[in-house]
């Protein structure tokens, strides 16, 4: 009968056979299960690490894009403000040009009116001189026709003044 190990009643052959099967099972598990399982775990670990790296890169890129967008927005605001300032300046310049043109036109109209008034005045003076000359000739002819006394001269002058006043 085979010897017992440590006082147990299990034969040594059974223990050796069980140990052999167990070691064989460990070798087979290591070769067929543990190796591929560890490979899968390693791949999974690498995949997770790659995903984390990609997420960190994407996060950094997103932060960079956000900062670029902020800069672009800031620049757009500055450009918009400059555009508004240019438009205001252009409006003021245009206003000044319009006011200057209006003043110039008003001066032109005023000068034209002054010239027209001067021309009308000269025509009125010429007409008055013509009437005075005509009346002077008429008075002279009346004086020549009759010899005037002092009373007649006064009356003639008053009549002449009256005629000149009515002619106006």
From Swiss-Prot:
Belongs to the ATPase B chain family. F-type ATPases have 2 components, F(1) - the catalytic core - and F(0) - the membrane proton channel. F(1) has five subunits: alpha(3), beta(3), gamma(1), delta(1), epsilon(1). F(0) has three main subunits: a(1), b(2) and c(10-14). The alpha and beta chains form an alternating ring which encloses part of the gamma chain. F(1) is attached to F(0) by a central stalk formed by the gamma and epsilon chains, while a peripheral stalk is formed by the delta and b chains. F(1)F(0) ATP synthase produces ATP from ADP in the presence of a proton or sodium gradient. F-type ATPases consist of two structural domains, F(1) containing the extramembraneous catalytic core and F(0) containing the membrane proton channel, linked together by a central stalk and a peripheral stalk. During catalysis, ATP synthesis in the catalytic domain of F(1) is coupled via a rotary mechanism of the central stalk subunits to proton translocation. Component of the F(0) channel, it forms part of the peripheral stalk, linking F(1) to F(0). This is ATP synthase subunit b. The lineage of its organism: Bacteria, Bacillati, Bacillota, Bacilli, Bacillales. Its main location: membrane. It comes from Bacillus cereus (strain B4264). The chain crosses the membrane at residues 9-29. It is a single-pass membrane protein. It is found in: Cell membrane. It comes from the Bacteria. Keywords: ATP synthesis, Cell membrane, CF(0), Hydrogen ion transport, Ion transport, Membrane, Transmembrane, Transmembrane helix, Transport. It holds the Pfam family ATP-synt_B. GO terms for molecular function: proton-transporting ATP synthase activity, rotational mechanism; proton-transporting ATPase activity, rotational mechanism. GO terms for cellular component: plasma membrane; proton-transporting ATP synthase complex.
């Amino acid at each position: 009968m085979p010897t017992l190990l440590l006082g147990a009643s299990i034969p040594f052959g059974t223990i050796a056979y069980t140990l052999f099967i167990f070691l064989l099972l460990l070798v087979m598990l290591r070769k067929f299960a543990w190796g591929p399982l560890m490979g899968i775990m390693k791949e999974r670990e690498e995949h997770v690490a790659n995903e984390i790296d990609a997420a960190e890169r994407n996060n950094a890129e997103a932060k960079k894009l956000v900062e670029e967008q902020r800069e672009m927005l800031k620049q757009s605001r500055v450009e918009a403000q400059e555009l508004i300032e240019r438009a205001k300046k252009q409006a003021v310049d245009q206003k000044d040009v319009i006011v200057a043109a209006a003043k110039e036109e008003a001066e032109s109209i005023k000068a034209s009116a002054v010239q027209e008034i001067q021309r009308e005045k000269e025509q009125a003076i010429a007409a008055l001189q013509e009437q005075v000359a005509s009346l002077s000739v008429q008075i002279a002819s009346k004086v020549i026709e009759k010899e005037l006394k002092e009373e007649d001269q006064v009356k003639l002058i008053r009549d002449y003044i009256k005629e000149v006043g009515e002619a106006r």
